Amino acid sequence: MNSKVDETPHLLRQRDQFVPRGLVTAHPLVIDRAQGAELWDVDGKRYLDFVGGIGVLNIGHNHPKVVAAVQAQLQKVSHACFQVVAYKPYLDLAQRLCEMIGGQEAYKAAFFTSGAEAVENAIKIARAHTNRSAVIAFRGGFHGRTLLGTTLTGMSQPYKQNFGPFAPEVFHTPYPNAYRGVSSDMALKALDELLATQVAAERVAAIIIEPVQGDGGFLAAPVEFLQALRALTEKHGIVLILDEIQTGFGRTGKWFGFQHAGIQPDLVTVAKSLAGGLPLSGVVGKAAIMDAPLPGGLGGTYGGNALSCAAALAVIDAFEQEQLLARGEALGERLRQGLLRLQARHWQIGDVRGSGFMLALELIKDDEARTPDADLNQRLIDEARIGGLLVIKCGVYRNVLRFLAPLVTTEEQIDEALQILDGALARVLN
């Protein structure tokens, strides 16, 4: 007789009792341990993790280089606050990121804690540099859950419900979406119209864009669109901010998504996979722009914590030593081909898209009108979990299934995930 009692139901009741409903947990699981691209819950069941803590674990769970770096740093300095005293991991990380992003140009970096905090500080820096106040963001974009981050985010539900009034002088314009009929030319014309009718270019401090929209549905901005945006911002003295919080650190096959377009942003926001699971974010940008705020204008008690900076340095080392950029690109192609095979058999998969190892399926109710099917998406997510695969949804209509597996995922795990997804599709469609 098996006397083992599952812990999960009790722990989920504890979660419901003591954690507010506004903090959604996508899967009714309680995790005990993790390694690489795998998780085990408190009852011992194994799952393939194709969420990666929502894109935080490009390096995988508990990478040995990251674990060793954090353990070593913990023996020296765990926290000191950079506004009080400097410490070497912060300085070394700032130099490496500036060299990675800026090349031979003079760049500087400031570190914070969360992605939303990096976005807010990027806007502050842009406003200080230009002495302008307006900001343009994109429909479907996601830039965090703080009040300014929510204002910049181009989706209403659930992020903006009952949280207003929002920050002033933030404007939204269409993002290219070939599947929904929005070309680069159409998006650029809409931006021109915005500048002609709602806010003059000489009042715009910054334009902020994700090179691949994350929560908005894994839409990749075409190269020509990013290049045109760079030309427009240079013409009008507008700071171009690339939000690389989800796309950075190998997710698209390059260090950063903007590198596919061959452009040089003014400011870049980084977070998520930067520190391999530890809380760390940053703004990296041209030195003249980064130095615009007065002394004391930037900061944060935990920003650039010594443990997180040590972890980030280990992440960069691991990427270079293990050729993870090339690996991610190869894994992305393997996953893409598998998803295309599924699409060929199921018309409900309207689109397979993304960049590198940042891929998604868009699910629809009918092939002609392409009506979003959020219900099918949720049922597929639930069925995949039962089969041992964790994935989550995104998209303005929540009908997009996204994949954010670690770059250390094996080919066998990719194939296993595709097999689980295939079976889950068959069950929910029948």
What are these regions (language model features)?
Residues 2-430:
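Conserved N-terminal phosphate-binding loop of PLP-dependent enzymes in the Aspartate aminotransferase
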